[in-house]
Regions:
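Strongly charged
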Residues: 2-5, 9, 16-77
Length: 77
Protein backbone atom coordinates (compact mmCIF):
# COMPACT_ATOMS: atom_id res chain seq x y z
CA UNK A 1 0.00 0.00 0.00
CA UNK A 2 1.21 3.53 -0.73
CA UNK A 3 2.54 5.52 2.22
CA UNK A 4 0.14 8.44 1.78
CA UNK A 5 -2.86 6.11 1.49
CA UNK A 6 -1.80 4.13 4.59
CA UNK A 7 -1.51 7.29 6.69
CA UNK A 8 -4.97 8.43 5.56
CA UNK A 9 -6.66 5.03 5.96
CA UNK A 10 -5.29 4.54 9.49
CA UNK A 11 -6.25 8.13 10.39
CA UNK A 12 -2.75 9.00 11.55
CA UNK A 13 -3.13 11.97 9.21
CA UNK A 14 -6.56 13.32 8.26
CA UNK A 15 -5.90 14.19 4.61
CA UNK A 16 -3.90 12.38 1.98
CA UNK A 17 -2.56 15.68 0.60
CA UNK A 18 -1.08 16.50 4.02
CA UNK A 19 0.56 13.06 4.12
CA UNK A 20 2.02 13.76 0.67
CA UNK A 21 3.40 17.13 1.81
CA UNK A 22 5.01 15.59 4.91
CA UNK A 23 6.68 12.92 2.79
CA UNK A 24 7.91 15.43 0.21
CA UNK A 25 9.42 17.51 3.04
CA UNK A 26 11.33 14.51 4.44
CA UNK A 27 9.22 14.22 7.61
CA UNK A 28 8.51 10.49 7.24
CA UNK A 29 11.44 8.10 7.62
CA UNK A 30 12.04 4.34 7.33
CA UNK A 31 15.52 2.88 7.96
CA UNK A 32 17.06 6.38 8.07
CA UNK A 33 15.73 7.12 4.57
CA UNK A 34 13.07 9.75 3.86
CA UNK A 35 10.11 8.23 2.05
CA UNK A 36 8.19 9.52 -0.94
CA UNK A 37 4.36 9.61 -0.93
CA UNK A 38 4.19 6.61 -3.30
CA UNK A 39 6.62 4.46 -1.27
CA UNK A 40 5.25 0.98 -0.63
CA UNK A 41 4.51 0.16 3.02
CA UNK A 42 4.41 -3.43 4.27
CA UNK A 43 3.60 -5.04 7.60
CA UNK A 44 6.63 -5.03 9.87
CA UNK A 45 7.89 -1.65 8.62
CA UNK A 46 8.82 0.87 11.31
CA UNK A 47 8.11 4.47 10.41
CA UNK A 48 9.21 7.68 12.11
CA UNK A 49 6.89 10.64 11.59
CA UNK A 50 7.79 14.20 12.49
CA UNK A 51 4.41 15.89 12.75
CA UNK A 52 3.71 19.51 13.68
CA UNK A 53 4.03 19.15 17.46
CA UNK A 54 4.93 15.51 18.01
CA UNK A 55 7.24 12.71 16.99
CA UNK A 56 5.63 9.35 16.35
CA UNK A 57 7.34 6.00 15.78
CA UNK A 58 5.02 3.24 14.63
CA UNK A 59 5.16 -0.38 13.46
CA UNK A 60 2.87 -1.33 10.58
CA UNK A 61 0.80 -4.42 11.44
CA UNK A 62 -1.49 -4.54 8.40
CA UNK A 63 -3.00 -2.20 5.82
CA UNK A 64 -5.29 -0.68 8.45
CA UNK A 65 -3.47 -1.35 11.73
CA UNK A 66 -0.35 -0.09 13.43
CA UNK A 67 1.13 0.03 16.91
CA UNK A 68 2.76 3.03 18.50
CA UNK A 69 6.33 2.29 19.57
CA UNK A 70 7.19 5.78 20.76
CA UNK A 71 5.44 9.13 20.97
CA UNK A 72 6.94 12.44 22.09
CA UNK A 73 5.72 16.00 22.15
CA UNK A 74 8.09 18.35 20.37
CA UNK A 75 8.13 22.12 20.23
CA UNK A 76 8.86 24.44 17.37
CA UNK A 77 7.01 22.25 14.83
Amino acid sequence: MRLDKFLKETRIIKRRTIAQQLAKNGKIIRNNIALKPASEIRSGDELELFLRSRFLKIRVLSEKEYEVIEEKKIWGG
